[in-house]
Amino acid sequence: MRLKLGISTCPNDTYIYEALVQGLENSPFEWDVHFADVQTLNEMVRRGELDVAKVSAQVYPKIEAEYACLSCGGAIGYGCGPLLLSSVGNAFCPEKPVVLPGADTTAALLFKFWHKKTGQTEQKIEYALFDQVYRSLRSKEAVQGVVIHEHRFTWKRDGLYLLQDLGAFWEENTGTPIPLGIAVARKSLGVNTIFQIEDEIRKSLNIARKREKLVTPFIDKLAQIDDPNVMEAHIRMFVNDFSEEVGERGRASLGYLWTLVKG
């Protein structure tokens, strides 16, 4: 069976899915792989263009009629949330726009969760692709923005300022891990096929865990940042037991998030 798979180029995704993409032994599937940033993947799934994808957890209520949330292959964890950064200093500026990495991203929802909980005034929001958010902060074109992925590890060396760890704020206020991303599969594939897809993802992850090195040429080639230490830190932070099985705590975090999305 040939299926369309969508994942990002971030090291945690390419680490988990590399063996699957390159072809597992005796696999019933062949994959047409689409690499894109998470907001683009969210939009592709909302248009029904992918059979299987890694998307923002926030987007799921908008696609749940057509897609099943898989029990593995996502990104949930502790101490791994998006960061609200400033290019000019340590104080949040309500009068200045905040640049977010896509309207459907979990990062956008976590910012709004923090903004509402802390009683901030009405805020102007702008959207850009995640790497553009970071570039605009580095160039001081933007005063403040929310960064994700590899840029979580590079802001200090680039002279930016931390205003709020949005993941830590989520953990403190909900008591649950941070539900960043999930894997989804088209419901029309059928339950048995979806179970097979989950098995394939777990096999791929287990193969990755047995490698001597975290960063392979496949991961290095696709990463948006040319620093193997950052790639390794990224994988260690975002790939964990929740990647293999969402479990009760993971489901609790997703349920809390989806309740917020649905209002």
Segments (PLM) and residue ranges:
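Beta->alpha turn/N-cap motifs
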Residues: 11-12, 37-39, 48-61, 146-153
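A short beta-strand-loop structural module common to alpha/beta enzyme folds
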Residues: 26-40
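Hydrophobic/proline-rich hinge and linker segments of small-molecule sensing/allosteric domains
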Residues: 69-90, 170-188
